[in-house]
Amino acid sequence: LEEQSLIPIRNPDEMGLDIEEAVKRLNASAEYKMLFQKIFGQRPDAKNLAAAFAAFEETLETVDSKFDDWSNNLGKLTAQEERGRQLFVGDKAKCFDCHRMEDFTTDEFKNIGLYDERKLNDAGLYNITKKENDKGKFKTPGLRNVAVTAPYMHNGMFKTLEEVLNYYNSPDWFIENSVNRDDALKTPLRLTAQE
């Protein structure tokens, strides 16, 4: 979690800062220097910045939604929300195949087609395992609070959920020569604009 927590700082679509610059900014603040000294016994650095972010992320509560109320028989979904739920768990959108459990993820590594060995050249899990069939695989993210966590995908290439769905509707239109795309994603979803 600590390693992951620094990614949004470096990501140009989020904070777009070098970690060193983020640490420099923290050290320029008397308040943050005092807080880091109190908690970590030293001034801010990359290691304790990651630890602070990870500790914060562990406090986030994400299971208090209307869907949670519905699943615990504490509330009802509107007709539109129920249609969305049916799409999510059904055979047309197939979201539930990869996004299930409490956090809407299986925590499995999948290649959703965002790897072509050229422009999209982050090989994902392959960088660790060196197994050819792991090229382009990334851990399936949870979808809790997904509406407020843009940008999307491991590389932040989609700015809106509509762009994400457009990709799943026509993946070959976005990336012609995807390498090792998961079989479950080789057929476009063909969702309508209303869906």
Predicted regions and their residues:
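Periplasmic c-type cytochrome electron-transfer domains
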Residues: 1-195
